[in-house]
Amino acid sequence: LVIDLEPRELGYYHVPTYMADQSGDLTFQVPLRSLLAIDSWVHIFIADVVFGLFSRGARFEKQLNEDLLFKLRILGKALYEGRQILECSELVQIGRNCIIDPHAIIHGPTTIGDNVTINAGAVIENCIIGNNVNVSQDVQLMLSVVGDGAFLPFKTGLFMTTVMENSMIAQNTCLQMCVVGRNTFIGAGSTFTDYNLVPAPIRAVDGHGNLSYANRPVIGSAVGHNCRLGSGLIVYPARTIESDVVLAASKERRVIDKNVRYEDSDHHKFKFPGLHKRLYPPKREESQELESW
């Protein structure tokens, strides 16, 4: 079975050549049709950002170039609403009962769910935002997916990042190319880096729990479900923090330079460790091989 995904190369940053190839472009092969086996968190990143948001943008550009009526409809809607083309309701779809400050900037293609609050100074570009989400002042969202019930306090920054439902990314925290699980808290002033300062290949955990080359010059990290991360942490690229982990910045561990397992969680040293329940134990008894394409 051969499926033509109709890929096209799209750049998302022009950077110095030491961060990319000789052309200085960071690019993805973006398919117009999507088919992907998900074995690890890196595949979730690819599915949401590359096969999801980038592909939606590529399909929009293709239709805009080939369909004159579509182009005229968008232009007419923008003129009627008195908005820029990328801000018109044809490209920015907003659900019911939303409260959006007029000083927020939202560029499409963007989809916003029901009961969403977006405050002044927020900038949102090409994102998918679920229901019951709170986006506070000066939040920056670009090419990101935000799940239902998430809370983003002021000056949170997400770039090419997936945040699953009921999670909170506290103020002045920056996540780039990351995946965050459900019911997780990440404290204020934390930074998730995505680039090796020396040109060593980036490796991430694969579906079998082994370190494999990520085949990307830049990539962020993964935080599991039901995690509690304190303020002021710095996380190196491609690190994995398992579900149910609690991390508190300390003299011993403020910079996360290794993958963190549940057994390494800080809450085991707390006075009442039983107050943080383990909700997502690994299914180690299932020893069958992962099916993959």
Model regions and ranges:
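Terminal amphipathic alpha-helical/low-complexity segments used for targeting or macromolecular assembly
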Residues: 1-85, 89-90, 238-239, 244, ...
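Residue-level signal for well-ordered alpha-helical positions
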Residues: 50-51, 147, 181
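Residue-level "contact hotspot" at macromolecular interaction interfaces
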Residues: 91-93, 111, 128, 145, ...
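Short, solvent-exposed loop/turn positions at domain surfaces
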Residues: 86-88, 106, 123, 174, ...
